[in-house]
């Protein structure tokens, strides 16, 4: 899977996201503080990663900032992107299952190495629900303007 990763800070957990995704066999394209010459600010770096998903150049994105909130807000401004700020495995599983999330937002402050691995395990194990009400909710997101 091709995954766009952004961070507004070159923090150890941001590097761990990249390393862990690569260890799992994914191709990583980095943005923001993780890519020399990129604008590092959370709004710009998260937008760049999210656009990769929206334009079909990446399958998913992981967007990071200190709290994860700004990165998730910026990513969700990109049409077609459904970013979920996840601080635990249960939220990551639910975001994939019920919301068909295609961008994972993470807090650089709160996410430890072991927690990151749990979140990624749940994220990649999760699959979008086939339930009619879940599909209807996700479809309705495209209608909201």
Task: Give, region by region, the residue ranges found by the protein language model.
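Short, structured active-site "lid" loops
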Residues: 42-64
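Glycine-rich phosphate/diphosphate-binding loop of Rossmann-like nucleotide-binding domains
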Residues: 4-24
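C-terminal binding/interaction regions
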Residues: 2-6, 10, 89-145
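Mid-chain, well-packed structural core segment of small domains
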Residues: 63-64, 69-109
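Short active-site oxyanion
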Residues: 2-3, 58-61, 80-82
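Short amphipathic alpha-helical segments
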Residues: 17-19, 73-77, 117-118
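A short beta-strand-loop structural module common to alpha/beta enzyme folds
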Residues: 27-38
